[in-house]
Protein backbone atom coordinates (compact mmCIF):
# COMPACT_ATOMS: atom_id res chain seq x y z
CA UNK A 1 0.00 0.00 0.00
CA UNK A 2 2.79 2.41 0.95
CA UNK A 3 4.56 1.66 -2.33
CA UNK A 4 1.38 2.37 -4.28
CA UNK A 5 0.98 5.70 -2.50
CA UNK A 6 4.61 6.64 -3.18
CA UNK A 7 4.26 5.74 -6.85
CA UNK A 8 1.13 7.85 -7.05
CA UNK A 9 2.95 10.80 -5.48
CA UNK A 10 5.89 10.45 -7.89
CA UNK A 11 3.50 10.24 -10.83
CA UNK A 12 1.62 13.32 -9.65
CA UNK A 13 4.84 15.31 -9.26
CA UNK A 14 6.01 14.23 -12.72
CA UNK A 15 2.70 15.21 -14.28
CA UNK A 16 2.77 18.57 -12.50
CA UNK A 17 6.30 19.24 -13.77
CA UNK A 18 5.29 18.26 -17.29
CA UNK A 19 2.23 20.50 -17.14
CA UNK A 20 4.33 23.41 -15.86
CA UNK A 21 6.83 22.93 -18.69
CA UNK A 22 4.02 22.76 -21.23
CA UNK A 23 2.66 26.08 -19.97
CA UNK A 24 5.91 27.98 -20.53
CA UNK A 25 5.77 30.72 -23.14
CA UNK A 26 8.53 31.26 -25.70
CA UNK A 27 9.70 34.34 -23.77
CA UNK A 28 9.90 32.34 -20.53
CA UNK A 29 11.82 29.51 -22.21
CA UNK A 30 14.35 31.94 -23.70
CA UNK A 31 14.73 33.73 -20.35
CA UNK A 32 15.45 30.42 -18.62
CA UNK A 33 17.95 29.49 -21.34
CA UNK A 34 19.71 32.83 -20.98
CA UNK A 35 19.87 32.35 -17.21
CA UNK A 36 21.30 28.82 -17.58
CA UNK A 37 23.88 29.85 -20.17
CA UNK A 38 25.13 33.13 -18.67
CA UNK A 39 24.12 33.36 -14.99
CA UNK A 40 25.40 30.18 -13.32
CA UNK A 41 26.64 31.25 -9.89
CA UNK A 42 27.21 34.89 -8.95
CA UNK A 43 30.63 35.00 -10.60
CA UNK A 44 33.09 32.64 -12.20
CA UNK A 45 36.39 31.92 -13.91
CA UNK A 46 37.46 29.61 -16.72
CA UNK A 47 40.55 28.87 -18.78
CA UNK A 48 39.74 28.72 -22.48
CA UNK A 49 41.54 27.13 -25.42
CA UNK A 50 40.35 28.23 -28.86
CA UNK A 51 41.19 26.24 -31.99
CA UNK A 52 40.49 27.61 -35.47
CA UNK A 53 40.06 25.35 -38.49
CA UNK A 54 42.99 27.07 -40.24
CA UNK A 55 45.35 25.80 -37.54
CA UNK A 56 45.58 28.97 -35.45
CA UNK A 57 44.85 28.95 -31.72
CA UNK A 58 44.11 31.29 -28.83
CA UNK A 59 44.50 30.70 -25.09
CA UNK A 60 42.80 33.01 -22.62
CA UNK A 61 41.14 33.34 -19.23
CA UNK A 62 37.62 34.68 -18.80
CA UNK A 63 36.11 36.17 -15.63
CA UNK A 64 32.44 36.97 -15.08
CA UNK A 65 30.66 38.83 -12.30
CA UNK A 66 26.95 39.54 -11.92
CA UNK A 67 25.92 42.98 -10.71
CA UNK A 68 23.84 42.53 -7.58
CA UNK A 69 20.14 43.27 -7.88
CA UNK A 70 19.70 42.93 -11.63
CA UNK A 71 20.71 41.30 -14.90
CA UNK A 72 23.75 43.50 -15.52
CA UNK A 73 27.05 41.64 -15.78
CA UNK A 74 30.75 42.31 -16.23
CA UNK A 75 33.21 40.19 -18.23
CA UNK A 76 36.99 40.33 -18.37
CA UNK A 77 39.04 38.34 -20.90
CA UNK A 78 42.84 38.11 -20.79
CA UNK A 79 44.83 36.49 -23.61
CA UNK A 80 47.91 34.41 -22.80
CA UNK A 81 48.91 32.97 -26.18
CA UNK A 82 50.03 33.06 -28.95
CA UNK A 83 52.48 35.95 -29.13
CA UNK A 84 50.37 38.11 -31.45
CA UNK A 85 47.54 38.35 -28.89
CA UNK A 86 49.45 37.83 -25.63
CA UNK A 87 48.54 40.41 -22.95
CA UNK A 88 45.58 41.62 -24.98
CA UNK A 89 42.49 42.08 -22.80
CA UNK A 90 38.80 42.62 -23.37
CA UNK A 91 36.22 44.13 -21.00
CA UNK A 92 32.42 44.09 -21.24
CA UNK A 93 29.83 45.84 -19.10
CA UNK A 94 26.60 44.12 -20.10
CA UNK A 95 23.43 46.15 -19.55
CA UNK A 96 20.31 44.35 -20.85
CA UNK A 97 17.94 46.82 -22.47
CA UNK A 98 20.81 49.18 -23.32
CA UNK A 99 23.95 49.04 -25.44
CA UNK A 100 26.77 47.14 -23.77
CA UNK A 101 30.04 48.94 -23.05
CA UNK A 102 33.04 47.09 -24.57
CA UNK A 103 36.75 47.87 -24.51
CA UNK A 104 39.72 46.10 -26.11
CA UNK A 105 43.32 46.69 -25.01
CA UNK A 106 45.92 46.29 -27.78
CA UNK A 107 49.33 45.95 -26.06
CA UNK A 108 51.36 46.37 -29.26
CA UNK A 109 49.91 49.88 -29.60
CA UNK A 110 49.42 50.49 -25.87
CA UNK A 111 45.89 51.46 -26.88
CA UNK A 112 42.50 50.93 -25.26
CA UNK A 113 39.94 50.79 -28.05
CA UNK A 114 36.23 51.29 -27.47
CA UNK A 115 34.17 48.79 -29.44
CA UNK A 116 31.13 50.42 -31.01
CA UNK A 117 27.73 48.79 -30.36
CA UNK A 118 27.43 48.13 -34.09
CA UNK A 119 30.59 45.99 -34.02
CA UNK A 120 29.32 43.44 -31.49
CA UNK A 121 28.43 41.02 -34.29
CA UNK A 122 31.91 41.03 -35.79
CA UNK A 123 34.61 38.37 -35.41
CA UNK A 124 36.05 37.84 -31.93
CA UNK A 125 39.86 37.90 -32.35
CA UNK A 126 39.69 36.47 -35.86
CA UNK A 127 37.60 33.44 -34.92
CA UNK A 128 34.16 32.22 -36.00
CA UNK A 129 32.76 33.37 -32.66
CA UNK A 130 31.46 36.94 -32.39
CA UNK A 131 31.97 39.55 -29.68
CA UNK A 132 28.29 39.17 -28.85
CA UNK A 133 28.76 35.44 -28.20
CA UNK A 134 31.01 36.18 -25.22
CA UNK A 135 28.39 37.97 -23.13
CA UNK A 136 25.14 36.99 -24.86
CA UNK A 137 22.42 38.70 -26.82
CA UNK A 138 19.78 40.83 -25.10
CA UNK A 139 16.44 39.08 -24.65
CA UNK A 140 14.52 42.18 -25.70
CA UNK A 141 16.38 42.47 -29.02
CA UNK A 142 14.31 39.71 -30.61
CA UNK A 143 10.76 38.44 -30.86
CA UNK A 144 10.58 34.82 -29.68
CA UNK A 145 8.26 32.15 -31.06
CA UNK A 146 8.01 28.52 -29.99
CA UNK A 147 8.36 26.67 -33.29
CA UNK A 148 8.45 23.09 -32.06
CA UNK A 149 8.52 20.97 -28.92
CA UNK A 150 10.17 17.55 -28.97
CA UNK A 151 10.49 14.97 -26.22
CA UNK A 152 13.75 16.52 -25.00
CA UNK A 153 13.96 20.04 -26.45
CA UNK A 154 12.21 23.30 -27.16
CA UNK A 155 12.87 24.83 -30.56
CA UNK A 156 12.50 28.62 -30.61
CA UNK A 157 12.64 31.01 -33.56
CA UNK A 158 14.08 34.45 -32.75
CA UNK A 159 13.44 37.38 -35.09
CA UNK A 160 15.32 40.68 -34.61
CA UNK A 161 13.19 43.71 -33.76
CA UNK A 162 15.72 45.90 -35.60
CA UNK A 163 16.66 43.90 -38.73
CA UNK A 164 19.02 46.60 -39.97
CA UNK A 165 21.28 46.10 -36.93
CA UNK A 166 22.11 42.45 -37.65
CA UNK A 167 23.16 40.24 -40.56
CA UNK A 168 20.56 37.48 -39.99
CA UNK A 169 16.85 37.31 -40.79
CA UNK A 170 16.21 35.06 -37.80
CA UNK A 171 17.89 32.34 -35.79
CA UNK A 172 16.58 29.09 -34.36
CA UNK A 173 17.69 27.74 -30.97
CA UNK A 174 17.34 24.21 -29.60
CA UNK A 175 16.98 24.30 -25.79
CA UNK A 176 17.28 21.27 -23.52
CA UNK A 177 14.12 20.75 -21.45
CA UNK A 178 15.98 19.51 -18.38
CA UNK A 179 18.87 21.97 -18.11
CA UNK A 180 17.50 24.79 -20.29
CA UNK A 181 20.96 25.07 -21.85
CA UNK A 182 20.92 25.89 -25.57
CA UNK A 183 22.32 22.90 -27.45
CA UNK A 184 22.42 24.52 -30.88
CA UNK A 185 21.66 27.80 -32.66
CA UNK A 186 21.31 28.16 -36.42
CA UNK A 187 21.31 31.53 -38.19
CA UNK A 188 19.50 32.06 -41.48
CA UNK A 189 19.77 34.91 -43.97
CA UNK A 190 16.96 36.80 -45.71
CA UNK A 191 16.73 34.03 -48.30
CA UNK A 192 16.18 31.43 -45.59
CA UNK A 193 19.63 29.94 -46.13
CA UNK A 194 21.64 28.62 -43.20
CA UNK A 195 24.97 30.45 -42.94
CA UNK A 196 26.06 30.10 -39.30
CA UNK A 197 25.78 27.53 -36.53
CA UNK A 198 26.85 27.53 -32.86
CA UNK A 199 26.60 24.34 -30.82
CA UNK A 200 27.45 22.96 -27.38
CA UNK A 201 29.49 19.81 -27.94
CA UNK A 202 30.11 18.79 -24.33
CA UNK A 203 28.35 19.58 -21.04
CA UNK A 204 29.43 18.78 -17.48
CA UNK A 205 27.86 19.56 -14.12
CA UNK A 206 30.23 21.78 -12.13
CA UNK A 207 29.37 22.88 -8.59
CA UNK A 208 25.77 21.91 -9.33
CA UNK A 209 25.57 23.93 -12.56
CA UNK A 210 25.21 22.17 -15.95
CA UNK A 211 28.03 23.86 -17.88
CA UNK A 212 29.13 23.76 -21.54
CA UNK A 213 32.79 22.69 -21.61
CA UNK A 214 33.17 22.60 -25.38
CA UNK A 215 31.44 24.78 -27.98
CA UNK A 216 31.77 25.11 -31.73
CA UNK A 217 31.00 28.00 -34.08
CA UNK A 218 30.73 27.30 -37.80
CA UNK A 219 30.66 29.74 -40.70
CA UNK A 220 28.69 27.49 -43.03
CA UNK A 221 29.00 29.91 -45.93
CA UNK A 222 32.82 30.03 -45.79
CA UNK A 223 33.39 26.49 -44.56
CA UNK A 224 35.38 27.52 -41.47
CA UNK A 225 34.91 26.65 -37.81
CA UNK A 226 36.25 27.43 -34.34
CA UNK A 227 36.12 25.21 -31.27
CA UNK A 228 36.54 26.48 -27.72
CA UNK A 229 37.26 24.22 -24.75
CA UNK A 230 36.68 25.40 -21.18
CA UNK A 231 38.72 24.02 -18.27
CA UNK A 232 39.49 24.94 -14.64
CA UNK A 233 35.92 26.25 -14.33
CA UNK A 234 35.05 27.66 -10.92
CA UNK A 235 31.94 29.46 -9.68
CA UNK A 236 31.38 31.82 -6.75
CA UNK A 237 35.03 32.68 -6.15
CA UNK A 238 34.48 36.17 -4.73
CA UNK A 239 35.68 38.31 -7.63
CA UNK A 240 36.04 42.01 -6.80
CA UNK A 241 34.39 44.83 -8.76
CA UNK A 242 37.72 46.63 -9.19
CA UNK A 243 38.88 43.93 -11.63
CA UNK A 244 36.24 44.91 -14.16
CA UNK A 245 37.47 48.45 -14.81
CA UNK A 246 39.36 50.08 -17.66
CA UNK A 247 42.40 50.46 -15.40
CA UNK A 248 42.92 46.68 -15.31
CA UNK A 249 42.93 46.34 -19.07
CA UNK A 250 46.56 47.50 -19.02
CA UNK A 251 47.37 45.92 -15.65
CA UNK A 252 45.83 42.43 -15.59
CA UNK A 253 44.86 41.22 -12.10
CA UNK A 254 46.41 38.11 -10.57
CA UNK A 255 43.06 36.34 -11.01
CA UNK A 256 43.90 35.96 -14.71
CA UNK A 257 47.70 35.87 -14.71
CA UNK A 258 48.10 33.03 -12.21
Give the ranges of each region predicted by the language model:
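N-terminal mature ectodomain segment of secretory-pathway/periplasmic proteins
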Residues: 24-108
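Gly/Pro-enriched, hydrophobic low-complexity segments
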Residues: 80, 91, 101-105, 111-117, ...
Amino acid sequence: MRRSVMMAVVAAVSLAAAAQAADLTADEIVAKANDAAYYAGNNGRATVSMSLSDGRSRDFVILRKDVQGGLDQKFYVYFKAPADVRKMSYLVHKRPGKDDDRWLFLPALNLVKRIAPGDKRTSFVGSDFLYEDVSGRGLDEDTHELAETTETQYVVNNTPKNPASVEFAYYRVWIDKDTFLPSKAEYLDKNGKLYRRVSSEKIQTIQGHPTPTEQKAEDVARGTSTTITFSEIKYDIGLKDRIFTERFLRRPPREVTQ
